[in-house]
Amino acid sequence: MEQLAAALLAWITAHSDLETRSLPLPEIVLMSPQTLTREYYHGAPHLIPTDGVDDRLNALYAAEDGPHGTIYTLAPAHIDGAEDFDDPADNPLFREILLHELVHHAQWQTGQPVGWACQSQGEKDAYHLGGQYLKELRITDPIPNRNFWAHMYSLC
């Protein structure tokens, strides 16, 4: 997973103004949908959906967890299309999810949030870069209206 994260960080540097070459890698924790849901709702367990899974969650970045931040993500086998790959981590949809969280890692590690009105402002770049990554690979984007959602999720 470290090699994949390093390659995706290099892609981020090549396609944005984020300089990632000297950044430490975050810890990457692969999880089941149930475990990721519990991680997300750890401060408010009464809000966990009754079936134990929030289907909207793919991954989370926690800047203050671990020595250099932690990405909690669905294990590759849980991502749509995983069965089409000998190694589910080769699935471009999994890689885009990881790339999205690595954008947040780069934002936090380079101090960008200091100038933001709220943490949500980092979503626009993460969504746009994820869409660009999929487009480069000629993969159908699973998020219809990505630009709309990038805008909505970045509002404070």
Which residue ranges define each predicted feature?
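Post-HExxH zinc-binding segment in Zn-dependent metallohydrolases
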Residues: 117-152
